[in-house]
Each structure stands twice: as C-alpha cells, then as structure tokens.
Amino acid sequence: MAETAEPEGGAPSPQGPPEGSALLEERPGEPDPAGPEASEGAAKAPSGEGAGAAAKAGATEEASGGRDGEGAGEQAPDAGTESGGETPDAKGAQIEAEGAPEGTKAPQLGEEGSGGKQVEESGPDCELRGEAAREAEGQAAAPAAPGAQEEAVPGDSVDAEGSIDAGGSVDAAGSVDAGGSIDAGGSMDAGGSVDAGGSIDTGGSVDAAGSVDAGGSIDTGRNVDAGGSIDAGGSVDAGGSMDAEGPAGGAHGAGGEPQDLGAGSPQPRSEAVEVAAAENEGHSPGESVEDAAAEEAAGTREPEGSEDAAGEDGDQGRPQEETEQQAERQEPGPETQSEEEERPPDRSPDGEAAASTRAAQPEAELSNHLAAEEGGQRGEGPANGRGEDGEASEEGDPGQEHDITLFVKAGYDGESIGNCPFSQRLFMILWLKGVIFNVTTVDLKRKPADLQNLAPGTNPPFMTFDGDVKTDVNKIEEFLEEKLAPPRYPKLATQHPESNSAGNDVFAKFSAFIKNTKKDANEIYEKSLLKALKKLDAYLNSPLPDEVDAYSTEDVAVSGRKFLDGDDLTLADCNLLPKLHIIKIVAKKYRDFEFPPEMTGIWRYLNNAYARDEFINTCPADQEIEHAYSDVAKRMK
C-alpha cells in the first residue's frame, strides 16, 4: 500500500504515548515517505510549511493584507512524517466541543462550520476573505481544549457536535471546505488520522453517507469522488479536490443527515487504494490544492462543485468510467437505505446519475434474489408433483404425480416383505410404470386398526390411489394400465394374446404336488407338474411372429427372446414370474424337485428375470418363501 505524507494540521495517528508540546516540533532528518511529489507540493507553501499551509495562505493572503499564514504552519507537528509513524496517542487528538474555551464555538447539528458552506451562502469575495481570516485568527488565539495534548490547527479545525472518539467513525454531515474543517454531525473516529492540512475543495461538500475510516491519512491533493464512504487503510492520495454530491446537489436533512451518495458501507481498503493510485498518476499532491485556493480567492470557482465543474478542468476531471466503477464496488447497507428514504431527492446532474446507479444495484440484487427463489422452488416442488389446484403436473415432471400406497403382506418378522405372489405382482407393475409410490408391509397377526378401517375384511395386497382404496388384484392391474398410460408411462400389456395364458396352469399343478402327503400319489402329481412346465418351456422356445423374418429362407428353430412376450417385461411376466420363482424354491426345499436342465426356455426365462431389478428387488427372501410353506409342505407318509 502506498504511503503519503500527512498534510499539516491533521490529528496524529494513534501510536506512541502523548508527549505534549515536544511533538509540535518538526523532526529533522526523518525521510519523507511521500516521495518527491509530496516534497514538491510542500515546497510551494509559504514559509516552507507544506501543502496545508500553502492552501491556507492562498485562501487568506488577500483578506489579511499579505499575511503569510504562519499561524497554521507553527502548529503542524507532523509535516513530512510518515503516516502511522511515531506520533502521540489518538487521545491527544480528542477535541471535545463542550469542553472547549469560550473562544471556540462548536456548531450544532445542521450548522455549517466550514469555509466551503460559507462561500455558497455569502457569495461575494469580500465575505469569503473576511470570514476565512476571522476563522483563522479566532482559532489561532484559542487555547487548546482541556485534555487535549495537541493544539487545534487554525487551517484545519475540527468542529464536533459530539465527541471525537478513537475507534469510531467520521459522519460528515457538513462539508469540508478550502479551510480544511470537518463538521462532524456525530463523532469522529481517529483510528489513524484524518489529515485535511491542504484545502479540500468540493465544489459543494464532502458528504460521507457511511463512515471515513482513516487507518492512515487522507491526503487530498487530487479529485476523489466519494460516492459512499472512504476507507483509507493506509493513505489515499487524491491529487485534486474531494468531489461528491454536496449541498448544491441536494439539501441535508434537518438533523444533519448525510446526503444520499448511493452507498453506505465502507469501500474495501484494497479497492480504495487502487482507485487512489490510478487517480494519482501525473499529479503532485499539492498541485490542485493551490489551484483550488487560488480559484476560490479570485471567485472563479463555481460553488456547485460536482463533476460538471471538475470535468471542465483536464487536471482535476475524472473519467465517468472511474466514477461508475467506484459506485459499482460500493454496496449500500441497511442503515444507509433507511436514511436514503428520509432524504429529499437529488436534482443535480450528479445526483441523478448517482440515483440511477443506486437504482440499478437494487434491481440487480432483487433479480438475483428472485432468480434464486425461483430456482429453489423449481428444485423443491410439491412432494407429490401436484399443484395447489390439485391438477397433475406436466408430462416429464420428475415429481410425484399421484399419491399411491401399496400394502403388501409382511414376513414372519412383521416388517420385511412376505411371501405373496399377488403382492409382488402389483409391486412389479408399479415399479415398471416408473411411478413414485409407497410400500407398507402389513402384519396379519396384529393388523393395525387404521388398516382394518381402511380396507375392512381385506387382506393384502390392496392399494390406495389418490385416496381411493383398491382391493381386487385383477382390477388394480387393469386400472393401473389405463391410468398410467403412455406417453408418460410405458405400456405393459402384451402384444401377443398367447403370452397371457402361457403357464397359467403351472401354479395350480404345483400346489397339488406340494400339498400331497402320500408317496404313492407323489409320482402322479409330479408328472402333472412336469407336463405343465414342458408346455411353458415349449412356448418360451417357440419363436414369436415378429421373430420370424418373412423374407428369410432360414427357419428360426428356437426363440431367443428374454421374456414371455419379447425382450421386455409385461403384465404377463408380472403374474407368472413370482409364481415360477416360488415353485423353484419350495419344490427344491421340500420335495427335492428341480426344473429339468433340458427345459432351456424356462431356465433362460428365470435367468433373465434375475438380472432385472424390477424382479429381484420385489422378491421376498428365500427363507421367507420356505417359512411360508413349512406348514403346507408336510412330509409324505
């Protein structure tokens, strides 16, 4: 961070213990941190006292009959010293208005205590020169305030209505004029020092809507447009005058409220230094200070002091792009926004430009806020995919479109999925449809009362669809195929009617086979079961009409399809596969019966089903199936 010399008359930075009047003397031999430019600006001042004395002398020389402004120069203890160097404690800079002698008058809130305001009100040059001279003489003769260990500089008076606390903020309700005075409507926080030794020419005034946090010092040698607050972590070297929307652009509130500057939060320290560094190219620190003092003394500067006056001077003007960039970097705080609502509108060109900048920022924030809310609403959505009016959402909406709950038989532990081919049948259909649904297992041993009231006298499976209770399995299948239809949901009906009847007698043959307890009759029941299985196997190995190419000379001997009606699962598979799986598990467990290896169609069919999530994730555990038939598959005698 670049460091610049503090102009004379500024409050000392808060480092080192107070040393009384010994610190009023210049420190010989200390290096000038501001470089050649600061030394050149200081050399232009009468009596060699620096930019602050030069500005004061230029403003009061004609009025006081050639007085060389040495009163301001005698009280500059830190001329040429480094910002933040070894200076008295910040408490030495506390000048309490209520504790000052009678010769020093602290202006009340809303009063103008600066030369810039007086120029606007008085107008004639004679009143300007006389008032500046009286102010300088009166403040030079006044003794230091009690408790203050450093005298107030006449060219740089600090009029504080409250107290000047170390660690607070500078709320400049008044204006900073050529005399360098700061009218603090609230309190001044000398965290470092606010150095106004040179003249701060605002054409209007410097209105800090936020706070001036001077961690180092503010060397006003150039033009700084304070669209909001000035946060000088090190030192801000402004080559011209501090240009802001002053009283000419819009009147202050009755209570000395700061004027609307479009931003209230402090500007980031690094950004403030970058802006000051960009503005400081090609200008010496005291260059515009002397020009400002000379123009005010000659009565040539306009009191309106916004960008119009500064823009006509090539040295003092600043491109509009820099002003817009600085305004964009400042974000208004909640306190500033509340103050802006109470202040009258700014009618000056700069005020209108600042208002447009302020208006653009909330619109962008509101737009982003609305976009964020709309994005959140789209992401969350209704839980069941339905709008407030109860209508189903649009096609393709990933949300839940219907409120569906499937009640299935619970296992012997009362929680897991139990053995029930009809429950698995509906489970597979809902899964294949791709609809969002809930599954509730029902323990038949202790059926809850609410379920008894929901479907009295009905055992699982049953279903609720958007509040309607469905209990018949075959009708539920038809209802789901009709309600959850394409294009939103896949069609599960078969293309070939023969697929619906294939294997329809297998489960009945199996039930007779597993319930038989007579060894003599076992062979009969087993042959009956094998006959039904061979019929099913033959259908699975027989090519479907769409598998046969009418233009091919080769006959397809064996089908290669995965399921009953083709390579996709259908309603026929949802009915047959759960039963075929139960036959495979129970016959092996209790009758040591397996599907013959030569039944390649059945084995291909089962293996393809075991590779599908819709089947294996709806199947009960093998132990559940075996446990369910433990009482049925009695030992043969």
UniProtKB/Swiss-Prot annotation:
Residues 466-637 form the GST C-terminal domain. The keyword Ribosomal protein does not apply. The chain crosses the membrane at residues 422-442. Residues 155-244 are annotated as: 15 X 6 AA tandem repeat of [GEA]-[DGR]-[SN]-[VIM]-D-[AT]. Channel activity is redox- and pH-regulated. Inhibited by IAA-94. The keyword Membrane applies. Its EC number is 1.8.-.-. InterPro entries: CLIC, CLIC_N, Glutathione-S-Trfase_C-like, Glutathione-S-Trfase_C_sf, Glutathione_S-Trfase, Thioredoxin-like_sf. It is a single-pass membrane protein. Phosphorylated. Sequence repeats lie at residues 155-160, 161-166, 167-172, 173-178, 179-184, 185-190, 191-196, 197-202, 203-208, 209-214, 215-220, 221-226, 227-232, 233-238, 239-244. It is an enzyme of class 1 (oxidoreductase). It catalyses: chloride(in) = chloride(out). Residues 305-314 have a biased composition (Acidic residues). PANTHER family: CHLORIDE INTRACELLULAR CHANNEL PROTEIN 6 (PTHR45476:SF1), CHLORIDE INTRACELLULAR CHANNEL PROTEIN 6-RELATED (PTHR45476). The active G-site contains a monothiol Cys-X-X-Ser motif which mediates glutathione-dependent redox catalysis. Members of this family may change from a globular, soluble state to a state where the N-terminal domain is inserted into the membrane and functions as a chloride channel. The redox status of the active cysteine in Cys-X-X-Cys/Ser motif likely determines the capacity to adopt a soluble or membrane-inserted state. A conformation change of the N-terminal domain is thought to expose hydrophobic surfaces that trigger membrane insertion. In the soluble state, catalyzes glutaredoxin-like thiol disulfide exchange reactions with reduced glutathione as electron donor. Can insert into membranes and form voltage-dependent chloride-selective channels. The channel opens upon membrane depolarization at positive voltages and closes at negative membrane voltages. May play a critical role in water-secreting cells, possibly through the regulation of chloride ion transport. This is Chloride intracellular channel protein 6. It comes from Oryctolagus cuniculus. The lineage of its organism: Eukaryota, Metazoa, Chordata, Craniata, Vertebrata.
